C-alpha cells in the first residue's frame, strides 16, 4: 500500500550531490513531494530529508539505488513511530485594524511568531507537524491568505540513535 514516507540521506557535501540524488529519483520515476537539505554537525556532510509516496518494495529499491551513488554514506527510511517531524511555514494573511488582534491571538495559540506587520497584512512564522500547519492554514483562510512558503519536512529519530 502506498503511503507517505520520509527518507534520510547523509552524503559528503560535494559539488552536485543533491542534483545526482534527485536525478536518480527522476530517472526511476519516484516522485519527491518535499525535500529539505542542509549541512550536518559533522563538517563536510549534507543531510537531506525527502518525502515520497511508496510501498515497502519501492522504498527498499530506492534505498538500494541511493546507496550506489558515490558520496552517499547513509540512507534511512524513517519508521512511523519514534520520529520527530517538523516543517517551517511563512504565511502572509490579510489584516486590517479590525482583524489584526484576532489573527495575532490565533497565531499565539499556535505558537506562531509575527515577523512583519504592514497596514494591510501580517507575516507569521509557524513550525510544527503537518496537522498543526493545516489547522493554522484553515483558521487563516477565513481572513484571506495572500501567500504561503513552506520548507520540506525535517525529521530525526528519537533517542540516541540516528
Model-derived features: where do they sit?
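Long, contiguous binding/interaction regions
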Residues: 1-47, 51-162
Amino acid at each position: 500500500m502506498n503511503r507517505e514516507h520520509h527518507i534520510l540521506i547523509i552524503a559528503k557535501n560535494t559539488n552536485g550531490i543533491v542534483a545526482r540524488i534527485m536525478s536518480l529519483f527522476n530517472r526511476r520515476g519516484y516522485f519527491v513531494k518535499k525535500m529539505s537539505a542542509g549541512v550536518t554537525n559533522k563538517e563536510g556532510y549534507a543531510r537531506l530529508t525527502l518525502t515520497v509516496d511508496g510501498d515497502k518494495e519501492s522504498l527498499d529499491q530506492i534505498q538500494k539505488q541511493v546507496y550506489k551513488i558515490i558520496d552517499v554514506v547513509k540512507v534511512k527510511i524513517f519508521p512511523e513511530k519514534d520520529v520527530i517531524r517538523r516543517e517551517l511555514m511563512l504565511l502572509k494573511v490579510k489584516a486590517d485594524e479590525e482583524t489584526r488582534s484576532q489573527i495575532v491571538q490565533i497565531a499565539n495559540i499556535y505558537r506562531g511568531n509575527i515577523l512583519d506587520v504592514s497596514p494591510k497584512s501580517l507575516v507569521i512564522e509557524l513550525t510544527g507537524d503537518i496537522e498543526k500547519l493545516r489547522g493554522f492554514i484553515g483558521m487563516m483562510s477565513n481572513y484571506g491568505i495572500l501567500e504561503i512558503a513552506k520548507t520540506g519536512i525535517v525529521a530525526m529519530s528519537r533517542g540516541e540513535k540516528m
